[in-house]
Amino acid sequence: MKKVYYGWWVVGGAYLLLLCAAGTQFYAFPVFLDVMVREMEWARTQVALALTVGSFVMGAVGLLVGWLIHRVGLRPVMVCGAIIAGLGFFLLRTITEPWQFYLYYGLILSVGITGIGSVSTMTAVEMWFDRGRSTALGIATVGVGVGGVVMPLLAGWLISKYDWQTAYACMAGILILVGTPISAIIMRTPRERRVVPEQAQQKGLKAGDATIGQALRQKSFWLISVSAMLSYLAYSIGLTHQVAFAVDMGIDRLAAAGAVGLLCAFSIPGRLGFGRLGDIMDKRYVMMTAASLQAVAFVMLMKTTNLSMLYVYSALIGVGVGGLTPILPGLLADHFGGSHFGAIYGASGMVNTLGMMIGPVYGGWIFDTTKSYSLAFLSGIIITLLAIILIYLAPKPRSQ
C-alpha cells in the first residue's frame, strides 16, 4: 500500500484548525452579538467594535506570526496560539463591561487565533505543495466552511439551553483540546520531516524566494491585497449583521443563526470548486468571478423580506467568499512563494483585514444612525465592484 504523502496530513490538520479557529472566533460572533445587545443593553456598534479591534490585532499580529514561523518554527507558534485563544474565550465568560469584551475578544482571543489561523495554516500547506497548490488550499479551507456551519448552531443551542457564559466556556475547551495536539503533532514542515515536497521533487520546480521588502515594492502585492480587503469589508458588513437584521424582521433567532450555517455550507463547494479552477486557469479571473457572486448576493440581501430570501443570499455569498479564500493565498504564492511566504502573507493580511475592521462597525453605525441596514448593504455592492476592478488590473504571475 502506497504511503500517504505527508503534505495531505498537513492539509487535514489545517482543515481541523481552521474549523475550530474560524468557526468559534468569527462565524459564531453574529450569534453572540444579538445576545450581548439584548442582555448587556449595549449598542450594536459597541458590540461590533470588538470584531473591529480583533481584526486590527489579527492584521498586525499576522505579520509577526509570519516572521516567527520563519525564525522559530511553525509548531511552537501554533501551540502557543491554541492555548492563548482558549484563554481568551474562557475569560469572555466573566465580562460585564465593554472594555473587557474588547480586551478578551479583541486582543487576547485574536492574538491566539492568529497563531493557529490562516497565516500559519496557509503557510504550512504552501510549504508542501507547488503543483496543485490551489486545490490543497481549497481542501484545507473547507474547514472554515464546516466550522461556520457547526459553530454558530452549537453556540446558538448552548445559549438557548444554558447561557452565553457556558457557550464561551465550550468554545475555549474546543480550541485547547483540539487545537493544541494538532498543532504539536501534525503541523510539521518538510525540513522537520527531512523531505523535499513531492511536487517540487517530481517536476524539478523551485518556487521564487522574494523577501517581504521586495514584495512590498511590487504593484501586484498591493492590487491583490487591497482587492481582498475590499471584498472582506463588504462581506463582514453582511455577515456581522445578518442575524440581527433577520431578527428585526421577526425571524426566529435560531433560524437566523442557521442562515450563517447555510452560508458556510455553501462556501464548501466554493472553496473546492474555485480552488480546483485556480490550478487550471488564471487565478485573477477566478477571484473576479467569486467576487461577482458576492455582489449579486448583496442585491438579494437588499430585497430580503423573509427567511427563504435570506437563505438565497447566504448561499450566494457563501459560494463567493468560499472561492476567494483559497485563491488569495494561491495567487500570492504564485507571485511571492518561498521561505518568506509566511511573512508576505501576514503583510497582506494586515492590509485585507482592514476590511474586517471597518465593515462591522460601519454596518452598526449605519443602523444606529438610520435605523436601517439599506445603505450598508448598498455599500457592500459598490465596494465589491471596486474589488473586482482592482484584481482585473493586477499583473499575471511570471510563472504562468
Residue ranges and their predicted role:
Residues 61-73, 271-282:
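Helix-to-loop junctions at the C-terminal end of transmembrane segments
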Residues 106-142, 337:
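Cytoplasmic helix-loop-helix junction between adjacent transmembrane helices
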Residues 9-35, 40-44, 65, 238-243:
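Extracytoplasmic
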Residues 140, 144-191:
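Helix-loop-helix hairpin linking two adjacent transmembrane segments in secondary transporters
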Residues 235, 255, 261-267, 273, ...:
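C-terminal transmembrane helical hairpin of 12-TM major facilitator-type secondary transporters
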Residues 25-33, 216-272:
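Extracytoplasmic gate region of multi-pass secondary transporters
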Residues 19, 100-115, 229, 309-322:
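Hydrophobic core of transmembrane alpha-helices in multi-pass small-molecule transporters
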